[in-house]
């Protein structure tokens, strides 16, 4: 329940940054590291006439309870309209309150700030981790403090060599890339180093790409790691500004559980909630957002090209907003079309590139693309993906447009992603089931990012079998992780003779009840009475023959129960591809994914009425938590 706050917050501050935990290393990375946070993840301050500064973002809701009280009557009145199926009024009332709470965040039609609002000063002496940690500034760093502190505390980098780039999240990627250039120069001068390494998260990844597109000739980048980067945008601007939200509640529940990073099964709290309720609420919010943020140039930078022209025509005057249009035209018609070319040129010049993406989830605001909740996987990586509920046909081993090596298999175990078509097939990793920028809650994602940024161990997706191109999340809320003993996660070959199951819980023991395969004529010996402690593994052998086929879809489901508490039987299904024969014939056609499960059950009138009441109480709790500012420690 506590983390449900993300339902409201994430739609304003869509692109969050992650924290990453790393194992201790004997030698610290000597190259300065610059962290580029995600959308609205940096601090903004208003300069008063007397030269003092007032923090305006992230806002201090707890200190503005008077404004909340003034708006409360309208909020309560509009809340009653929910029972008349008018959720939009409630959303509009909430948006009015948000406008009162953050009046200085408005921008002019040309994209400049109405008020003198500035990012924190990008002084390397103040924006390095040593200064930040010892000046008591941890809270103001929001969520990405976790990322920076881990790479320092676990020995990957020195505190004085890790820097945070502060920028105005309302501004476009071109403007922020120009500011990043100045910060890179300042960090080089401060450290005496000739090059720096960058890691950009979400919108920070788009800013990073803009920097490389415009300033690669500066020759000052050693590594560029992209964590769920918004390289080609998303449908956020279209869905919010045009009030076309279709809420993906099931995947929001997954996000809540992921953020909890606990053994608690939070999905039961919202299993009967009505997605339409939240869709109407958010569309009510959208009416206010479209006026409040229509001149935030970043909204257009984050919009994918298929929606950009329509939004530009509807919300931007060609004269008054000429500067917003000019800079975003560069992004959509110069930078994005040349993304593959830019990234490959980086590799040719010796710049290390790694792209980390999430997959296997819906777009939270609506759409049928394979995504990480906020960004379509295809627009993060360039890889062709089947729509949700679909997959490539059996026998498909990749179109091979970017990787033509017949020995490389770049199709995901779910047969939904063809990484052979990605911008960089050999330098792109996918983690299924990890929500957008939530790698700090996933042990695999943490170590993957650590190795890419701070070591030379992962030159490409073939460097280490422990870090294959495709895998599934190891967040504790999933309970178990499974792979076959001789193959990469998600694949099975004739070499395999057993399945390895790991208990992901941190506090609970489990007992595996059964393991069953679909699409394979094999059976598992699951009569073991062994109880798995947290982190412990068990190897279960199977009987039967692996078919002599290649690139054939299958799945395996593990059922288990928590051993030391009263709980229901839980299960997790793992995507599986058989790789055990000659290369088959496939035209790459898209077929229905028989392994895709989407709850589409309806609700009767009584159940719907009870759900509305429950949703309303949920939102009251969400609002109270939101106002304390506690949410920002998770989402920022």
What are these regions (language model features)?
Residues 536-542:
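Short strand-edge motifs at loop-to-beta-strand transitions and within beta-strands
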Residues 492-498, 550-554:
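Short, solvent-exposed loop/turn segments enriched in Ser/Thr/Gly
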Residues 249-320:
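Alpha/beta-hydrolase-fold enzymes
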Residues 516-528:
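Short, solvent-exposed loop/linker segments at beta-strand-coil boundaries, enriched for Pro/Gly
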Residues 501-507:
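Asparagine-centered strand-capping/turn motif at beta-strand->loop junctions
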């Amino acid at each position: 329940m506590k983390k449900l706050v993300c339902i409201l917050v994430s739609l304003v501050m869509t692109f969050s940054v992650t924290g990453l935990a790393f194992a201790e290393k004997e030698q610290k990375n000597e190259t300065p590291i610059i962290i580029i946070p995600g959308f609205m993840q940096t601090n903004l301050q208003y300069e008063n006439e007397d030269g003092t500064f007032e923090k305006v973002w992230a806002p201090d809701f707890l200190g503005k309870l008077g404004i909340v009280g003034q708006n409360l009557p309208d909020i309560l009145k509009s809340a009653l309209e929910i029972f008349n199926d008018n959720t939009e009024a409630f959303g509009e009332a909430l948006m009015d309150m948000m406008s009162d709470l953050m009046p200085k965040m408005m921008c002019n039609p040309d994209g400049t700030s109405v008020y003198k609002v500035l990012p924190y000063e990008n002084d390397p002496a103040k924006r390095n981790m040593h200064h930040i940690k010892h000046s008591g500034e941890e809270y103001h760093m929001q969520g990405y403090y976790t990322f920076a502190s881990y790479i320092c505390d676990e020995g990957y980098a020195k505190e004085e060599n890790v820097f945070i780039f502060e920028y105005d999240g309302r501004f476009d990627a071109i403007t922020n890339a120009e500011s990043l250039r100045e910060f890179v120069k300042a960090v080089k001068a401060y450290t005496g180093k000739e090059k720096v390494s960058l890691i950009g998260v979400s919108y920070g990844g788009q800013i990073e790409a803009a920097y490389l597109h415009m300033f690669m000739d500066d020759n000052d980048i050693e590594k560029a790691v992209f964590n769920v980067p918004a390289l080609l945008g998303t449908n956020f601007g279209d869905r919010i500004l045009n009030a076309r939200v279709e809420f993906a509640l099931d995947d929001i529940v997954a996000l809540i559980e992921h953020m909890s990073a606990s053994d608690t099964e939070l999905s039961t709290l919202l299993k009967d909630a009505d997605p339409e309720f939240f869709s109407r609420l958010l569309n009510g919010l959208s009416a206010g957002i479209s006026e409040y943020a229509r001149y935030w140039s970043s909204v257009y930078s984050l919009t994918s090209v298929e929606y950009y022209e329509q939004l530009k025509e509807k919300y931007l005057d060609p004269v008054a907003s000429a500067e917003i249009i000019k800079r975003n035209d560069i992004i959509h018609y110069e930078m994005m079309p040349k993304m593959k070319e830019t990234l490959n040129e980086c590799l040719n010049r010796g710049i290390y590139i790694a792209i980390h993406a999430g997959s296997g989830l819906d777009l939270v605001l609506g759409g049928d693309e394979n995504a990480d909740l906020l960004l379509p996987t295809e627009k993060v990586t360039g890889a062709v993906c089947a729509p949700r509920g679909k997959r490539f046909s059996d026998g498909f081993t990749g179109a091979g447009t970017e990787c033509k090596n017949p020995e490389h298999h770049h199709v995901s175990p779910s047969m939904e992603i063809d990484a052979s078509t990605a911008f960089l097939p050999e330098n792109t990793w996918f983690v299924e089931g990890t929500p957008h920028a939530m790698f700090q809650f996933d042990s695999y994602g943490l170590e993957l990012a650590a190795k890419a940024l701070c070591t030379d161990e992962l030159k490409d997706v073939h460097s280490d079998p422990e870090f294959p191109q495709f895998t599934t999340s190891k967040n504790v809320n999933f309970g178990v992780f499974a792979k076959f003993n001789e193959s990469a996660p998600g694949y099975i070959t004739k070499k395999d003779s057993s399945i390895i199951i790991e208990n992901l819980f941190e506090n609970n023991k489990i007992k595996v009840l059964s393991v069953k395969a679909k699409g394979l004529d094999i059976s598992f010996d699951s009569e073991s009475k062994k109880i798995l402690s947290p982190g412990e593994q068990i190897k279960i052998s199977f009987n039967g023959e692996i078919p002599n086929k290649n690139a054939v879809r299958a799945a395996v489901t593990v059922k288990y129960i928590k051993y030391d508490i009263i709980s229901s039987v839980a299960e997790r299904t793992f995507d599986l591809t058989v790789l055990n024969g000659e290369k088959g014939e496939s035209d790459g056609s898209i077929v229905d994914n028989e392994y895709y499960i989407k709850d589409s059950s309806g609700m009767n009138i009584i159940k719907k009425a009870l759900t509305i009441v429950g949703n309303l109480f949920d939102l009251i709790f969400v609002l109270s938590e939101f106002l304390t500012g506690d949410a920002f420690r998770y989402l920022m």
